[in-house]
Amino acid sequence: MILIIYAHPYPHHSHANKQMLEQAGTLENVEIRSLYHLYPDFNIDVAAEQEALSRASLIVWQHPMQWYSVPPLLKLWMDKVLTHGWAYGHGGTALHGKHLLWAVTTGGGENHFAIGSHPGFAVLSQPLQATALYCGLKWLPPFAMHCTFICDDDTLQAQARQYKQRLLAWQEVNHG
């Protein structure tokens, strides 16, 4: 099962993420957990989140990039849900062997993340990759949708279909 942990503080303002979720939602065996919908008060149900993670073979962290990082509720989710003795540390093997895909949208162009005046995209992914590896997850190459503020609907739809194809390809290789 693919579990999408979706974290967007303003989901109604994001055409890109909405289209990505719509495309992913057409696939079989996909569960979408919208953190800002489930936890508007930031009071995370750790047991429910761990149970959902236990059922997944592929975990997707989908969110807009905010200040070169994750939205605050996703960071809190990581702090609360990925606990010692469950996700890492002595006895913490619940996530071992599962795959993790980082699916991120950005307002800036891909060249904005080239090494130079701004950090490279690979550098920005390092904290998430380190978290994944520390929890025994298998890090997959990220899926990034850039320029989402200025893309027309056709471009956003095409990129959202690429996202769906990426998930479908993973399903075909890992479950069939």
UniProtKB/Swiss-Prot annotation:
Homodimer. Interacts with KefC. One of its GO terms (cellular component) is plasma membrane. Its cofactor is FMN. NCBIfam families: PRK00871.1. It is an enzyme of class 1 (oxidoreductase). Gene3D superfamilies: 3.40.50.360. Its EC number is 1.6.5.2. GO terms for molecular function: electron transfer activity; FMN binding; NADH:ubiquinone reductase (non-electrogenic) activity; NADPH dehydrogenase (quinone) activity. It comes from Salmonella typhi. SUPFAM superfamilies: Flavoproteins (SSF52218). This is Glutathione-regulated potassium-efflux system ancillary protein KefF. The keyword Cell inner membrane applies. It is a peripheral membrane protein. Belongs to the NAD(P)H dehydrogenase (quinone) family. KefF subfamily. It catalyses: a quinone + NADH + H(+) = a quinol + NAD(+); a quinone + NADPH + H(+) = a quinol + NADP(+). Pfam families: Flavodoxin_2 (PF02525). Transmembrane segments: none annotated.
